[in-house]
């Protein structure tokens, strides 16, 4: 309270026996505020969070999204300068998560507070984060503006954490002006990769940069075994085996494929990152530098 820090958790923390109005008012009552000040603050906060029509209802009469907005209102009403949100959308169904993802940036802007938002979903970080810190095994691996962290991951762990599905990796050897991926796929070394010392690297590329057709003349072709497909409607997740590596491709459209079938997939070298033997970024994907 004295530090003006508030927290919102994955579980909806509301008093079930109190109305939405009284839930929002409860922190101010504990602070000993006057009733007129409480009423003004509650109604302003309820308006910001679009809870005004629900003020006389109790939490169990609300949808999951409304309950979470009520919990957020309780955090914001006391004028906290720092609000910590610990996976606040994790317990909501898909539709409610999508609705609140649209609402939360507006709430951030209207409140004027600093928000620290913890999530395991890269998509949420990209949608909601002005700055992003990526964590791996309790250690911050990178911090910076969200688009920059996504496009220019400092190391392979950051690239893995900040990709959904996780970034795909394959061993790559650089010899003179040529890159060899795995045992059979080749591409010329361009841009930042051309200036790297010869040696062994780890190449990384995201799921959405795998295609089923050759779209560019220098696209790298990989022969893979289909492990499974997941068709979501407008997109298909293709799970692939490439030697001992396990990859996931995300391709547009419906592409049913038989498990165990052999197939070729393609990756544009412009979307390939190279990491050194310590996992540090050695050469960013050329597209990332052009963005």
Regions found by a protein language model. Name each.
Residues 2-6, 10-157:
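ABC ATPase nucleotide-binding domains
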Residues 151-175, 204, 268:
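C-terminal boundary and immediately downstream tail of ABC-type ATPase nucleotide-binding domains
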Residues 173, 230-232:
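A generic structural motif
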Residues 178-230, 256-291:
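Glycine/charge-rich catalytic "coupling/switch" loops of P-loop NTPases
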Residues 235-238:
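Short aromatic-glycine-enriched beta-strand elements
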Residues 240-242:
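Active-site beta-strand termini and strand-to-loop segments that position acidic
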Residues 248-251:
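Short alpha-helix capping/helix-loop boundary micro-motifs
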